[in-house]
Amino acid sequence: MTPVETLSLPRTPTIADIAAGERVCPVCSRSNRSEYVSLDSLPEDLQKLIRANAPGKSDDCEEVCGRCARLFERAKEHIIKDAAMQKDGSHVLSTPLRLDADERFTGEGVCIAFLDSGFYPHPDLTQPDNRIVAYRNLPDAEKDLSSLFKPDVASWHGMMTSVVAAGNGSLSNGFYRGIAPAADVVLIKLARTGRISDQDILDGLEWVLENREEYSIKIVNISAGGDAEKSYLNDPLSQAVEECSAAGILVVCAVGNAGHLPNHPVVPPASAPSCIAVGGLDDNNSINRARRGMYRSSYGPTIDGLQKPEVIASSIWVPAPILPHTPTAKQAALLEKLDKSEDEKLHDVIRENPGVDPDLDAAVGLLVHNIRQIIALKIGQENVINKHYKYVDGTSFSAPIVSSVAAQMIEANPNLTPSDIKRILISTAERLPHHEVDRQGWGVIDPRRAVEMALSLS
């Protein structure tokens, strides 16, 4: 057997390959002309893991490409020990695993600023080391980092975006981590409520420009949209984005979630020329390329005729943290406990946790199989992975994934400019077949190839 670690990366099959009978990996749907690994030649636990996460009938999976063998071999212990398992036996995979991120780089030494509605000092950012190097509350300047420990509704969004990018997965033994789990973060609260205006974002960018050297800010993530379509030629917010880029700060923006609307508008700051506007990928919680589709993300051309988004990244089934000390956290903890409890203990667990979930309170007198159905339904409805994490969706989470890859690239090659990073991400992206180019730009980011290209330019 060819050693797993020496196999080269397979490529995505073309129409010509398929027509010619090219072999396609049953797990990732990539093509590789010669380098396949027989599952029977792998350790039994690795065989079971690969079969459990292969689409379709697992018994039909007899061999996989070297890329998949390496990927699951690297992550085997983590998946078996820490990944949540779904009812079909497959696992809730992490973002780095699904996108095959390069584990050699963690964003160490790179600072990402997040502009959002609110934040929380989540353990995935603060344990074992606190990587929140600064917090700024623009509407309430007197409030410091200690005020973050009082969570409110506005805390959710920014907590999730920052952790999706830079969380180290401390509450999952490192499994549900971001692609840049060692990056430093600056958290900038833009508004008192969830509504964020053009002026709020502009104020945030101006703060970043004024403080970029003190905190060595290299990337700004903006998972928020402005008020309306505007030309970048006379829009102050777009001009601020251009100023950031000229100052050496990469600006990454969520393109929005209006792809289902007739005009599917792209608004500032995502419509600014130099930013990386990120659209949405639906990968169905799988590494199988054949299962990839588009999310309902907004798309251009912009009012100025610019192609937006430039790239797409996972925007559904994205593991993100649950805000601690909230009713949602209590509900998730109870659902996980019930899901893992033996049948004879279900009624007692519900009685011991009154008031957490009214539907569960009402189910305490039902038969066990009925309670199991309610638990499964609740876990699905609430997108619960476990007591600490849940699924989220939206391009608000695609953008921080791209920001985290950019942090890896800067760690690999600190001399990269914002335009270099954008060019590399575009040139290494992979287009989805059978989907409009306008919707996806240059396609799905490929973190591993992007980092390799960044290294090659150093």
What are these regions, as identified by a protein language model?
Residues L7-K57:
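Short recognition patches in nucleic-acid-associated and regulatory proteins
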Residues S29, G66-A69:
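Cys/His-coordinated zinc-binding microdomains
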Residues E35-L39, E73-H78:
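Short Cys/His-rich "knuckle" micro-motifs
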Residues G89, L97, D102-V164, Y215, ...:
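Active-site core segment of subtilase-fold serine proteases
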Residues L190-S274, N284-N285, I303-L306, N383-A399, ...:
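Substrate-binding/access-modulating region of protease and related hydrolase catalytic domains
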Residues I217-N221, A376-F397, E411-S458:
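C-terminal subdomain of the subtilisin-like protease fold in secreted/lumenal serine endopeptidases
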Residues K230-Y232, V255-P273, G280-K308, P319-I371, ...:
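Active-site-adjacent substrate-recognition loops and nearby beta-strands
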